[in-house]
C-alpha cells in the first residue's frame, strides 16, 4: 500500500506539472476574461502565438483564478502548474523584495504607459531583478501597469479634511502607508470584496482603477470619485514563464513570444485606459460626481512621496536587498527615459507603441540565451 501511494502521488505530481495536452500549455490569470489585462495579454496573445507558431505553442487560458489563486501564482508557474502566469508582486514580498521595492515606488510617476514600459525594461534587463526571477524559478517575460488609482467613495471626499478617518480599501504597501499619512484607515481586502464593503458601509472608499466602476459594478454603490492620482500598480509580472517550458522552446519560438508580448504590452495599456474612460462616463451618467482634490490633499500626496522613500529603503534592506537606494536611483533613470521616449507618441496607436517596445526593449534581447543561460 505504501508503494502504491507513493507511486500514485508521483504520477499525480507529474500530471499536475505537465501541460494539459502534448501541444497545449496552461496560461493563468486571476482577473476575469473580460478585463483588459486578460483580453489582450492572454486571450488574444494565445491566438496570435498559436497562429505564428503553426500551433506548436498553444496556450489554454485559465482566467478568474480558475487554475491558481492570486497568492499561489508565483509558486504555480515555478512548479509547472502553469507554463505562463500573471503575478501581483505584493502577494509575495519575501520572495520578490526587489519587485516590491520598485512596485511600491508607484507615486514617483503615475503615468501608466510610462510605468508599463519602464517596469518591463527593468524586469528584463536589470541584473538584480533577473537574479530574483531566477531564484524563484521564473523567466520574466514582461511587465504591465494598471491605470491610476482613484478614491471611489460612497460619501463626498474632496479635501484633506474629508479624507481623515475614512475607511479606504488599499492595495497594501505604499498605498496603506499613504492612507495612514493623510489620517485615513487602510483596509486590506481583495478587489472582489470592494462592492460589498461599500454597499454595507464597512468601507467609505475603494482605492482602485476606475474601470472597477464597471468591472466590479462599483458605480452602483459609489456616489463620488476623487481624481487625485494615488499611484498605479505594476508589481510582479504580466508574463512569467516556467523555466523548463521556456528552455524547451526554440529560439524562433521565444522570438515570437517577445514580439507578441511587445504588442500586448502596448495593447493592454490602450485598452485599459479606454475601459476607464467608458466606465467613468457610464458612472457619471448614472449620477456619480467627479471631484478634484483640494490643494492641501495634493500637497499631502507630494509630501508623502518624498517621505516614503525612506520606508521603501528600510523595508527592502530588512528583506535582504543590497543597495536599495541605488536600485531606486537606477529605476528612476529608466522611468525618466521612458517618459522622454513616449512624450510625442500617440497613446492610442497600438502599433506605434508596440514598435517602440520592440526597438527599445525586446529586439535587444538574445532569444538564444535569454532565460536559458
Where are each of the predicted segments found?
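Absolute protein N-terminus
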Residues: 1, 22-23
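Bacterial N-terminal signal peptides that target proteins for export
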Residues: 1-8
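N-terminal secretory/targeting leader peptides
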Residues: 23-113, 140-373
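Cleavable N-terminal signal peptides
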Residues: 9-10, 20
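Short, solvent-exposed loop/beta-turn-alpha elements that line the ligand-binding surface or hinge
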Residues: 109-135
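Sec/Tat signal peptide C-region and signal peptidase I cleavage site
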Residues: 16-22
